[in-house]
Amino acid sequence: NENSSVTTREQKKQTIYTDDAGQRMVIKNHNGYVSYTNYAKEIAEARHRSLYDSLNLSFDRLKLLDVALDDVRYSEFDFQSKNATYRSYINGFPIISADEYGSYQVQITDSGNQHLVFSLYTLQVPVPADSNAVQLPNTDDVMESLKQSGIDMQKINNVQIGYRESKNESSALVIDLTPTYFVKYNNVWIDYRDLVHNEEGSR
């Protein structure tokens, strides 16, 4: 809204922007993590919005960010929170990052409020890693290692192969991508190795 006034403040290593039109944006200074909320109700209320309509609305909001979406695909939709997730894909597999690199969360509530989470740092052209190929275990072995570590298997919602990002030691502008299994545990995606190690370490 061109006529609204924007207020900026710094708090706990993050920059917060608000205006009198019901918009709020928080940027974490150390990693470019962005959380944007719009309470202006630009979208009509709908208690029983269909999946088709929800995804159309979320993708329309995503396009308004004016970012390159060449490698970005729809990943999943949470019916309870009305949250749609879009991720960057490489060779058919998603990048799953705690810092939201390459991913976009778009939530449109029944009341019409909008909430977007993404990173200011977009992924550019992927380049092959110099390291040797990674040999992943089969899914049965992954599930068995989770079970043996004492994980509550009832809390696992999904398992899939994806790329884990890590900082490149030679350049701050490059991230390394390593294939691994991700487990959706308590509705949070986590590398299965971290889940196993955390559980074993808590014993």
For each feature predicted by the language model, list its residue ranges:
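Structured segments of extracytoplasmic/periplasmic soluble domains
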Residues: 60-68, 145, 149
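Beta-strand residues in well-ordered beta-sheet regions across diverse protein folds
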Residues: 87, 116-119, 184, 193
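Preferential activation on post-signal-peptide N-terminal prodomains/segments
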Residues: 1-64
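Short, surface-exposed beta-strand/loop "edge" segments at domain boundaries and coil↔beta transitions
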Residues: 22-27, 41-48, 91-98, 123-128, ...
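A short, surface-exposed beta-strand/turn
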Residues: 25-37, 98-117, 189-203
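Short helix-loop boundary/capping segments
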Residues: 107-138
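Hydrophilic extracytoplasmic domains
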Residues: 132-203
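Exposed beta-strand-loop-beta-strand "reactive/processing" segments of non-cytosolic proteins
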Residues: 2-26, 68-111, 160-188
